[in-house]
């Protein structure tokens, strides 16, 4: 999860 992909790869 990075700032550019929070929606596609959220840090859960």
Swiss-Prot record:
Keyword Secreted applies: yes
Tissue specificity annotation: Abdominal perisympathetic organs.
Family according to the record: Belongs to the periviscerokinin family.
Annotated function: Mediates visceral muscle contractile activity (myotropic activity).
Modified residues (Valine amide): 12
Pfam families: Periviscerokin
Single biological process term from Gene Ontology: neuropeptide signaling pathway
Sorted UniProt keywords: Amidation, Neuropeptide, Secreted
Recorded GO CC terms: extracellular region
Name this polypeptide is given: Periviscerokinin-2 type 1
UniProt subcellular location: Secreted
Signal peptide extent: none
């Amino acid at each position: 999860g990075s700032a550019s992909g929070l929606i596609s790869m959220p840090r859960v």
